[in-house]
A protein has these predicted regions:
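Long, well-ordered, tryptophan-enriched scaffold segments
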Residues: 2-6, 182-326
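N-terminal amphipathic, basic-rich helices that act as targeting or association modules
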Residues: 2-90, 245-267, 272-285
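Glycine/charged-rich beta-loop-alpha catalytic/anionic-binding loops adjacent to active sites
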Residues: 38-45, 104-120, 142-148, 354-368, ...
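Cofactor-binding active-site loop characterized by glycine-rich and histidine/acidic residues
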Residues: 50-171, 322, 339-340, 344-345, ...
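Non-catalytic terminal/interface segments that mediate subunit docking, oligomerization
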Residues: 74, 277, 285-398, 403-413
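Acidic, glycine-rich active-site loops and adjacent beta-strand->loop/helix elements
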Residues: 79-84, 151-158, 179-185, 287, ...
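A glycine-rich helix N-cap at a beta->alpha junction
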Residues: 93-109, 170-187, 205-208, 365, ...
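A short alpha/beta connector and helix-capping loop motif
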Residues: 158-180, 190-203, 294, 387
Length: 437
């Protein structure tokens, strides 16, 4: 049974619908962000949940709901573990203390829970394709609502995300993607795309040019000045990054912007929402912002159980977990057999392959959120005499069924698939059950 609802702070407690949010002066929105963070930290200390990701999207969520009006407009969150703030801003703040509890709010977006949850999820790489389908349906029906896909940079390591990007420009003229770049999935992001996004963030040349023009543009004021600013930024960026990835997919790129600057986010979203071309807005956020323990340990606070608000400490388990036993045992085996390799898909700490990574970095491979590639990569290793161990959560291993059957089993390749989190997952719910174990 759920506990009584705690009293909400003043601004947050006043929001029950879009009109209530619009009544709050823009100057007060940073205070609303503080109230949301405080409520999340206090509530999740009891229930557990995905604290770090949600602390990182507070300002983005506020800006989205100031500019767009759900449920008419559609906001689709990739994975949707970062949708807690969205729920709080759409009439569910008083229930946030029930998140991931029996008969409480789901820890993910859920269509049956609220009409504001346009699309349910739980796995990565789904938002862009689903949003594109909604855009196609809107266009076919002659309707005029906005569709916004919100995806973390880790989702761009998914093949499905790249498949969606490849289809956007030929499907619709009105499509908005927000790339929430915090450099993390569950663990630190890996691969060429992660390096590419970082290069966009840290270009000293572009940052210098943008800073030099900012004061001049602010003095101009008005709509024309705003349009000039966006055009100037786009032109400058294209000179510095002539082969900008998203331009090649037919998307107009904006950013990178400070994802914690509410006024800038609101101005930018208001500008791009009426463009007659597909756009991608790249924002940079800090996972765990507002809670020092989450900033110090982003992996731990990606998702966890109850914790002490004061220091973020969690209650330790009296006995080793199955994952810990698996990780340490594989390290012991690898000491005796140099052909053993370990593969994971952005979940080194969860599967405890971080122990293997520390002991044998050259034989450890993190493929990012690309389970299918990881399975096929393991098949290639096995075909050449190596002994690959693929450690992936059971719920994500479902994506590898074809590779397990067609590539590993049919060819009798000795790939060891090690499924973590087997069986039922009561906290995360049906999207994370290991139903096929």
């Amino acid at each position: 049974m759920n506990s009584p609802s705690p009293e909400l702070p003043e601004l947050l407690g006043s929001i029950h619908n879009h009109a209530d949010l619009m009544q709050i002066p823009e100057a007060e929105l940073p205070r609303l962000a503080e109230e949301i963070r405080s409520t999340l930290i206090q509530s999740l200390a009891v229930t557990g949940g995905h604290l770090g990701p949600n602390l990182g999207v507070v300002e983005l969520s506020i800006a989205l709901h100031r500019v767009f009006e759900t449920p008419r407009d559609k906001i689709i969150f990739d994975v949707s573990h970062q949708a807690y703030v969205h729920k709080m801003l759409t009439g569910r703040a008083e229930q946030i203390h029930t998140i991931r509890q029996y008969q409480g709010l789901s820890g993910f977006a859920k269509m049956s829970e609220s009409p504001h949850d346009s699309y349910g999820a739980g796995h990565a790489g789904t938002a862009l394709s689903a949003a594109l389908g909604m855009c196609a349906a809107r266009d076919l029906k002659g309707e005029d609502y906005h569709v916004v896909a919100v995806a973390g940079d880790a989702a761009f390591t998914c093949g499905t995300t790249l498949e969606a990007l490849n289809n956007i420009s030929q499907t619709t003229r009105r499509y908005i993607t927000i790339l929430n770049d915090n450099e993390w999935a569950i663990d630190k992001n890996v691969g060429a795309l992660a390096k590419y996004f970082n290069s966009l963030q840290t270009s000293e040349t572009f940052s210098w040019l943008r800073d030099k023009t900012a004061s001049f543009i602010e003095k101009l004021g008005g709509t024309q000045a705003k349009e000039f600013a966006f055009k100037l930024e786009g032109t400058t960026k294209n000179l510095i990054f002539p082969s900008l990835l998203f331009n090649k997919f037919g998307l107009r790129y904006f950013g990178p912007l400070n994802g914690h600057d509410i006024p800038t986010l609101i101005r930018t979203l208001n500008y791009i929402k009426d463009l007659n071309e597909p756009v991608i807005l790249h924002i940079v956020t800090q996972k765990g912002l507002g809670y020092q323990p989450a900033l110090d340990n982003p992996t731990k606070f990606h998702g966890l159980g109850s914790y002490c608000v004061h220091d973020g400490e969690t209650q330790g388990t009296p006995t080793p977990t199955f994952s810990q036993i698996f990780g340490s045992t594989l390290v012991d085996m690898a000491k005796q057999d140099e052909s053993i390799t370990a593969i994971t898909a952005a979940m080194a700490s969860g599967t405890k392959l971080d122990l293997f990574k520390e002991a044998f970095p050259r034989r450890y491979f993190d493929v990012g959120i690309a389970e299918e590639h990881g399975a096929l990569f393991a098949c290639g290793l096995a075909a050449e005499g190596m002994k690959p161990y693929v450690a992936i959560y059971s719920t994500f291993m479902q994506r590898c069924v074809d590779m397990i059957q067609h590539d590993a089993a049919l060819q009798k390749l000795p790939v060891r698939f090690c499924m973590d989190r087997a069986g039922l997952s009561p906290d995360d719910g049906p999207t994370h059950h290991g139903l096929f174990d």
